[in-house]
Amino acid sequence: MAEENIIFVGKKPTMNYVLAVVTQFNNNANKIIIKARGKTISKAVDVAEITRHKFIPDAKYEEIKLDTETLQGERGSSNVSSIEITLSR
């Protein structure tokens, strides 16, 4: 899969990411991966749901992956949850 078909969800407003997903589908992408970590996981789910229900009704969930990543910080290591949602049409 091309690197440009991956959307990393962060601190921006939810609709910015929805627009990015819709734009990728309109540019003939067959699959989009929405990735998020930690507190932004719920926003990634919102992005996928808004995209499916309001903009691209024929989009389907192809795969959902959950994982835990270990990050090294100043105070040692911490575990952070992550999600990858694959939408296709």
Curated annotation (Swiss-Prot):
InterPro entries: Alba-like_dom_sf, DNA/RNA-bd_Alba, DNA/RNA-bd_Alba-like. It is found in: Cytoplasm; Chromosome. Acetylated. Acetylation at Lys-11 decreases DNA-binding affinity. One of its GO terms (molecular function) is RNA binding. It comes from the Archaea. One of its GO terms (cellular component) is chromosome. Keywords: Acetylation, Chromosome, Cytoplasm, DNA condensation, DNA-binding. Pfam families: Alba. One of its GO terms (biological process) is chromosome condensation. Its main location: cytoplasm. The modification N6-acetyllysine is found at K11. The keyword DNA-binding applies. Belongs to the histone-like Alba family. Binds double-stranded DNA tightly but without sequence specificity. Involved in DNA compaction. This is DNA/RNA-binding protein Alba. The gene is albA.
